């Protein structure tokens, strides 16, 4: 069975239960959450995450493993503002604690960081420093470094940069990788015509065993654009065929696949989630040209 799901919302009083219910309504077999808003530091205490009820619902619906995404505000690549770096370190420690408390997530996806003008090498060294401050030998969750598109001053735009970070970290057995299809395509890798070649390259440079999460997104931009703008499955420059191949790749069957595709609709206040129909389409093997209209009609 393919492990596939999407980003879902953990909110209200139900929290983890709400996230699981939303995922199940999409026909998902895994899902990804933020433990609070991705753009700020406000967090409900662990006791209010409704973990027990959420886990029970997951168990009843055959969901064994979920993914946590660290908030965007963490930037341990920042060399110019010590307070930004320190916030990132402290907050990442807290996210590890919160993710461990969930008991059903083994991976926290992290955007490695941005060097904010100091240069990639300086940024990478700072990320290594931050991860060395955060990681402990007895933690039960991994930090999954996300492959980035190369927008602005992002670090992690190539497999070599990801490998350099991993190699510099003391407890690097606690590091894994989240392979984002849109980001990797936008960074210049030909996942459309030669995904197997790209995967082999990843294996040589980073090691395929570290690939523990997949973000499945189409891209609004051509390969190598360095933009990072997600598109709905089959409606971008990667296309349905390539994404279906990746989702069902025999070397990646155990890896959770998470959709982060955009909501659909002209009215900003009434956009519809695409995940139920996109998951269905990726499972059944046939591209549906009328998908966006069907999503709007939900």
From Swiss-Prot:
It catalyses: Endonucleolytic cleavage to 5'-phosphooligonucleotide end-products. Zn(2+) 3 binds at residues 183, 228, 230. Binds 3 Zn(2+) ions. Disulfide bonds: none annotated. Keywords: DNA damage, DNA repair, Endonuclease, Hydrolase, Metal-binding, Nuclease, Zinc. Its EC number is 3.1.21.2. Zn(2+) 1 binds at residues 69, 111, 146. It comes from the Bacteria. InterPro entries: AP_endonuc_2, AP_endonuc_F2_Zn_BS, Xyl_isomerase-like_sf, Xyl_isomerase-like_TIM-brl. GO terms for biological process: base-excision repair. It is an enzyme of class 3 (hydrolase). Gene3D superfamilies: Divalent-metal-dependent TIM barrel enzymes. GO terms for molecular function: deoxyribonuclease IV (phage-T4-induced) activity; DNA binding; DNA-(apurinic or apyrimidinic site) endonuclease activity; phosphoric diester hydrolase activity; zinc ion binding. SMART domains: AP2Ec. Its cofactor is Zn(2+). Zn(2+) 2 binds at residues 146, 180, 215, 260. Belongs to the AP endonuclease 2 family. Endonuclease IV plays a role in DNA repair. It cleaves phosphodiester bonds at apurinic or apyrimidinic (AP) sites, generating a 3'-hydroxyl group and a 5'-terminal sugar phosphate. PANTHER family: APURINIC-APYRIMIDINIC ENDONUCLEASE, ENDONUCLEASE IV ENDODEOXYRIBONUCLEASE IV. This is Probable endonuclease 4. It comes from Bacillus cereus (strain AH820).
